[in-house]
């Protein structure tokens, strides 16, 4: 009998297991695959070790930075280079994303970069909400609903949606407001209008430094070090063991073994409790040798609006223009990460498609001979649980939403409450 059985060794499960073992509890962790880390992992492309999934994390709340410090990675937390990202709209040329914005919501709708992006009429429509400060829209459930009500559809469709799809692979109308932009609802209630709420939140995060950060050498180092800590602290980590069914106080593995203990589910999709449909995402990584990219023609990358003609990618990250450590490791070559919805990446020569998309998005024709290496990684992300069966403890993306920052915070909080409760 173990005190806790954690099912799933992604970042959610690893953080929970570490918190529990550090509080003196016995922990068994079951991981279906042969490695820890889940969606946070690495691969080697063109001789460079790169993140094959998540490559950065939100700094809000300071939770991930605190975790990195406790894992001995404090000196390796790095901010991205300040080049900014671009947007490829459905029609017309790419433009630099408005500087003072949050998930595409402008803090000053009449700024010249907002007008350049959506036109004066739509920018003025967005500005008007500041003339009528009121909590109107604050009860909105989704991010899209709130922004549409306050600032109009053009801000949602042309600025917010391309960004939200790039990060979360869903539309702003499908994304819960509090998960997408923690603190925005409260700021709106306090300030009275959305642009002001965005300015308020931006000011807070500016005081705290960049909104996102990475780890020198790659974010996968977080899960590598979490895994090492679990071994060091005596967690019984079982790789290649899949949970077939879970109860609140026991797990039955696919091999029929029953393991008793308080169960924490950290495996998205395992409970299947009224989930939204899952989605497949494909990440294409190109390492290219093309000196014309040294000037970072589209800053740190390009988000792609739905319907951009001839482009299948959802987003492109110019990773060597985003991370100094990576530019140094690449020794003059460039690393481009393009994300695709699976249906756009199935049954095609993805290396060729990615090269064509990168050429169009970066405005620099990439000759086939410039490609040093290419890698394709397919991910399946189960839908978010709408509810969890009574009494089940759940951590990770299933319940915290997409992103390392939300997951680490939720997992730490839940595991902490369990040991605090039983201590009291
Ligand atoms: C391409 C891509 C890029 C991303 N980029 C970023 C980014 O830059 N920044 C960011 O913050 N987030 C990013 N994300 C999202 C982030 O990686 C995830 O939200 C997070 O890693 C999910 O962690 P998790 O522990 O909840 O789940 P997972 O990482 O999915 O881990 C769950 C684990 O459970 C295991 N498992 C499943 N079923 C069972 C079972 N029955 N029994 C035992 N084990 C089981 C799985 O094998 C897996 O190891 C990205 C995601 C993708 C796909």
What are these regions (language model features)?
Residues 46-134:
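Dinucleotide-binding Rossmann-like beta1-alpha1 core, especially the glycine-rich loop
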Residues 21-45:
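Glycine-rich FAD pyrophosphate-binding loop
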Residues 123-244:
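Active-site/ligand-binding neighborhood in enzyme catalytic cores
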Residues 2-29:
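N-terminal Rossmann-like FAD-binding beta1-loop-alpha1 element of flavoenzymes
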Residues 8, 79-81, 237-241, 247, ...:
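Short loop/edge segments at beta-strand edges and connector loops
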Residues 42, 98-101, 315-424:
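Conserved flavin/dinucleotide-binding core of flavoenzymes
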């Amino acid at each position: 009998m173990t005190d806790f059985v954690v099912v799933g060794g992604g970042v959610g499960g690893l953080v929970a297991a570490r918190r529990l073992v550090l509080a003196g509890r016995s922990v068994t962790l079951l991981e279906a695959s042969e490695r820890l880390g889940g969606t946070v992992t690495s691969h080697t492309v063109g001789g460079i070790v790169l993140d094959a999934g998540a490559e950065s994390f939100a700094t809000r709340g300071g939770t991930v930075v605190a975790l990195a410090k406790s894992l001995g990675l404090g000196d390796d937390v790095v901010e991205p280079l300040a080049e900014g990202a671009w947007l490829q709209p459905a029609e017309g040329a790419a433009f630099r994303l408005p500087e003072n914005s949050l998930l595409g919501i402008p803090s000053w709708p009449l700024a010249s970069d907002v007008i350049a992006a959506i036109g004066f009429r739509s920018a003025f429509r967005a500005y008007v909400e500041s003339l009528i400060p009121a909590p109107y829209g604050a009860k909105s459930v989704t991010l899209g609903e709130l922004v549409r009500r306050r600032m109009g559809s053009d801000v949602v469709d042309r600025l917010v949606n391309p960004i939200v799809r790039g990060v979360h692979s869903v539309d702003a109308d499908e994304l819960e407001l509090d998960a997408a932009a923690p603190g925005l609802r409260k700021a709106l209630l306090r300030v009275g209008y959305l642009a002001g709420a965005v300015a308020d939140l931006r000011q807070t995060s500016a005081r705290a430094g960049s909104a996102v950060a990475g780890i020198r050498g790659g974010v996968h180092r977080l899960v590598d070090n979490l895994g090492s800590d679990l071994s060091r602290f005596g967690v019984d980590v079982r790789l290649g063991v899949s949970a077939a069914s879970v109860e609140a106080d026991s797990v039955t593995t696919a091999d029929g073994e029953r393991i008793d203990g308080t169960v924490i589910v950290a495996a998205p999709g395992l409970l299947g409790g009224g989930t939204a449909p899952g989605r497949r995402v494909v990440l294409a990584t190109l390492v290219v040798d093309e000196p014309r990219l040294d000037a970072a023609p589209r800053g740190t990358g390009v988000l792609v609006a739905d319907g951009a003609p001839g482009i299948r990618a959802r987003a492109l990250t110019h990773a060597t223009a985003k991370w100094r450590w990576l530019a140094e490791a690449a020794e003059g070559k460039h690393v481009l990460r393009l994300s695709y919805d699976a249906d756009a990446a199935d049954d095609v020569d993805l290396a060729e498609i990615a090269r064509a998309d990168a050429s169009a998005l970066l405005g620099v024709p990439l000759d086939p001979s410039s490609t040093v290496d290419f890698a394709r990684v397919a991910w399946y992300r189960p839908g978010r649980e709408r509810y969890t069966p009574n009494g089940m403890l759940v951590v990770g993306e299933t319940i915290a939403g997409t992103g390392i920052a939300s997951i680490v915070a939720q997992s730490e909080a839940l595991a902490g409450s369990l040991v605090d409760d039983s201590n009291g």
